[in-house]
Amino acid sequence: MTKLFEPAACQVDLRTGAMSAATGAYQKRFRDLAGLYADEAAFSAMRENWNDTVVYEVSEFRPNERSGDLIFGTTRMLPGKVGDEYFVTRGHIHRQSDRPEIYYGQKGSGLMLLESPEGEVRIVAIDARTVCYVPPYWIHRSVNIGGEELVMLFCYPADSGQDYDCIAKAGGMRVRIVDDGEGGWKQVDNSSWRKRDAATIAALYGLEKKEKSA
């Protein structure tokens, strides 16, 4: 007989970004984000006051990690910059890369920075009451470009998984989001970014797995 999971309801506190009835949570402190930003000197200088500060935290409801279910939760992210570069999350592609994701902006002003395995770039605004669709195969990271906390709800298939190393191996994402000096933002090239070779691109699309199973 099929075992049914119990339905659930979770409340989101927009002040803290926390979600009730969460089954798990994690935090990323400023010190955990070393290597993400272009201005290493600015990052080092900020560590004296920011080192233990929680830059972003995630609360999630994870019933299981099997195909056919969903994982959902909230991300709360502080406003701020390292040099002129806005605060970002580490970012990832799904380990099962053909899995999509939905983000719903609940508070603040942010961007979803997306990159294809080949290096195409897309940027989607996430403001309050905005739904952002992240299609399969896109690497993605969140950016807080506002002056207040960014709170987002996310939802993705339970068997998606996360691959964080794909960004680090390429020297970061292809572009960075920086202050344009006029109260807004602009994208600039990441001089450390390295184009992925054909084998790496195929792996990110899951083509190797498909060939082996054929």
Swiss-Prot record:
Primary residence: cytoplasm
Residues given in the record as Fe cation binding sites: H92, H94, E101, H140
Keyword Cytoplasm in record: yes
UniProt keyword list: Cytoplasm, Gluconeogenesis, Glycolysis, Iron, Isomerase, Metal-binding
Enzyme class: isomerase
Record carries keyword Transmembrane helix: no
InterPro entries reported for this sequence: G6P_isomerase_archaea/bacteria, G6P_isomerase_prok, RmlC-like_jellyroll, RmlC_Cupin_sf
EC number: 5.3.1.9
GO CC, alphabetical: cytoplasm
GO biological process, one term: glycolytic process
Functional pathway: Carbohydrate degradation; glycolysis; D-glyceraldehyde 3-phosphate and glycerone phosphate from D-glucose: step 2/4
GO molecular function: glucose-6-phosphate isomerase activity; iron ion binding
Record field: catalytic activity: alpha-D-glucose 6-phosphate = beta-D-fructose 6-phosphate
Xref: SUPFAM superfamilies: RmlC-like cupins
Subcellular location: Cytoplasm
Quaternary organization: Homodimer.
Identification of the protein by name: Glucose-6-phosphate isomerase
Native organism: Sinorhizobium medicae (strain WSM419)
Name of the encoding gene: pgiA
